[in-house]
């Protein structure tokens, strides 16, 4: 089957055990290790939820690395890294960077919501907790108060800029993006983004909802007009763009996490077992703070028979 197609959870649940059982019996030790390059926003999701459950259910050991999705896809496309599995926070970006040369299919398995997390004891945090609209409070905040991700390294960064653009329209504040600039400071990684909030270096950060949950920080989700969580607003999101250093224009789109097993994977069977495990355990993914709507999982490209049957 090619193109975009929904795949029922029943299909995954019905055969997940068979695939995991088969690969668990055949692979042990180093051969059972699965190298995963994953979006940085999934660090706690994988380490605290998915990895322990998957390793308990199989003889496989995950070897995850976490990077911004733009960075990890570049590491694969330029031959620097050769993982078994890639997981991106932007499904379209994964297809654009990996299809044809490195992968033939991608499974979309989760969504997320953009917003702002904050430290309640800070001046900005107190205003947010009191109900001041985030954008008014942010404009008034002291310089370098709000941490944001680097748009050149991961989708969280360029979605943040797109959200500011869409928020300007939503709130009839045409200069909002420029007005927010003094209060924001760009961080090179998603892990540092929240580490600096937790240590008090910054009062807030623009993040995905699961990241705030991971760090036990209050979270204010942006409205549907610019939280990139409402598929029915896809055309509206697409009106916001970000242009990369190489001139590629990226349009806003709903947040969708996608994964694939690379064509040159060293452990193809293990990688497929892990992908199936993700798709077959939506409640586990939800417990980690992500969303799994009824429209997921779905896929692009021709799924391997082992995943589709």
UniProtKB/Swiss-Prot annotation:
Residues 1-32 form the signal peptide. The lineage of its organism: Archaea, Methanobacteriati, Methanobacteriota, Stenosarchaea group, Halobacteria. This is Uncharacterized solute-binding protein VNG_1595C. CDD domains: PBP2_ModA_WtpA. Keywords: Signal. GO terms for biological process: molybdate ion transport. The keyword Signal applies. Predicted to be exported by the Tat system. The position of the signal peptide cleavage has not been experimentally proven. PANTHER family: MOLYBDATE-BINDING PERIPLASMIC PROTEIN, MOLYBDATE_TUNGSTATE-BINDING PROTEIN WTPA. GO terms for molecular function: molybdate ion binding. It comes from Halobacterium salinarum (strain ATCC 700922 / JCM 11081 / NRC-1). InterPro entries: ModA/WtpA, TAT_signal. Belongs to the bacterial solute-binding protein 1 family. WtpA subfamily. Pfam families: SBP_bac_11.
């Amino acid at each position: 089957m090619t193109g975009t197609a929904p795949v029922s959870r029943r299909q995954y649940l019905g055969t997940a055990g068979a695939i995991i059982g088969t690969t668990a019996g055949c692979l042990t030790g180093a051969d059972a290790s699965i190298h995963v390059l994953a979006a940085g926003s999934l660090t706690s999701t994988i380490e605290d939820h998915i990895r322990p459950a998957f390793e308990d259910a199989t003889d496989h050991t995950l070897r995850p690395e976490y990077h911004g999705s733009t960075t990890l896809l570049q590491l694969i496309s330029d031959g620097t890294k050769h993982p078994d599995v890639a997981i991106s926070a932007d499904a379209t970006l994964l297809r654009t960077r990996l299809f044809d040369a490195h992968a033939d299919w991608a499974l979309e398995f989760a969504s997320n919501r953009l917003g702002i997390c904050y430290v309640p004891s800070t001046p900005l945090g107190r205003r947010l907790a009191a109900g001041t609209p985030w954008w008014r409070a942010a404009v008034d905040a002291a310089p370098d108060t709000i941490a944001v991700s680097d748009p050149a390294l991961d989708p969280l960064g360029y979605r943040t800029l797109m959200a500011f653009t869409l928020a300007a329209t939503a709130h009839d504040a045409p200069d909002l993006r420029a007005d927010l600039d003094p209060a924001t400071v760009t961080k090179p990684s998603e892990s540092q983004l929240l580490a600096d909030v937790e240590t008090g270096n910054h009062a807030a950060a623009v993040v995905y909802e699961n990241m705030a949950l991971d760090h036990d920080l209050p979270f204010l989700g942006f409205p549907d007009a610019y939280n990139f969580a409402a598929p029915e607003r896809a055309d509206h999101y697409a009106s916001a763009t970000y242009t990369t250093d190489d001139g590629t224009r990226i349009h806003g789109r709903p947040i969708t996490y996608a994964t694939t097993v690379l064509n040159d994977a060293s452990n193809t069977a293990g990688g497929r077992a892990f992908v199936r495990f993700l798709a077959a355990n939506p409640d586990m993914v939800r417990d980690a703070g992500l969303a799994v709507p009824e429209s997921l999982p779905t896929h692009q490209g021709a799924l391997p028979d082992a995943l589709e049957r």
